[in-house]
Amino acid sequence: ADDQPVFIPPAFTEGPTPTNFGPSDPTPTSQPPQIWLDASLPDSYLEQISSGLSIQVGKSRDQAAVVVLPGEENVITRWVYALAAPFPTIPDNVSESEIRSAWQGGESTTFNGSPIFLTANTLEVFSQLWGDPAEGSVQVTAADQLQETVWDRRPAWALVPFENLEPSWKVLAVDGISPLQKDFAAEEYYLSVPISVLGNSDLVSGLDLSNRDPEQLTTVMLTGVTALVRATAWTMETNGVEYPARDIGDWLLEADILHISNEVPFVRGCPYPDPGQSGLRFCSNPKYLRLLESIGTDVVELTGDHFGDYGPEAMLNTLELYNFRDWPYYGGGKNRADAQKAVKFEHNGNKVAFIGCNAKGG
């Protein structure tokens, strides 16, 4: 029996103890940065930047990484407004103090106590900057009715975003500064609205938009009737040919396109000017062309009554003088086709054409 094999039961290896995985707290997901846009910003500014933002617009200023609002804290751009009136308005300039006084309830002497007409958004923009206006000092009007309302209430004035100006408005300077001027500086202008960015401005681009781009503006000046005859010509003989431009020459040279409506032909041997001349047959000495050269003439109108006073030869000679100086002309010419052609300019993407006629005797 001692020789019998001993049975040894197999050993069982205990398996690993299962680990109990209980629920854990979720790791918070970081929120993308947001931008907060103040509701009192100009509508047109909000419309432009909202379409191209690469960052989410938030509803809370406190949670936003970038804040955009009116104010001088960290100015990135200025939104330009114009003080406008119906085109037949006589005054050209209004003082900052008169605007401020009118806003606060004082009576405008320039516009006979008229309220300042503006849209609801413009009211919100300037209330943020100037405080709430006095009762009755402004009148809110829908944007599509503003122009008609102000025209019906003449004499009257309005605050108009620069991009909404139309030819029927006359833009008034404020303390001598107008947004139509070539040397306009928005930071010096009372009606430019500063827009500031607070926070991490590197997170978003395209906030420095403007509603006044000088690269899209064209200045056209029209002198009206120009006749270098009688007392004007006599004064030029006395004080120098360029004397009439002494005080306005620099201003005329600012124009991108300067129009001159020269009434009379240039005639060699034209009689010496008589300031008391009673007759109505006129000509100018060709040396007077120096005046038109000095002010930067770009186009000449020939519809004046007296262009034919010295006959066809004088007219044709005058056209040659213009051609020699590369001055295009219209409303008259060497033949019907020449007289009927338009003079066209293209500047900063703007197209300007001049046409004219004289219907007297027609």
Where are these regions (language model features)?
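Acidic, metal/ion-coordinating pockets
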Residues: G206-G362
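Flexible loop/hinge segments at secondary-structure junctions
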Residues: F21-S210
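Ser/Thr-rich, Proline-interspersed low-complexity disordered segments
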Residues: A1-Q31
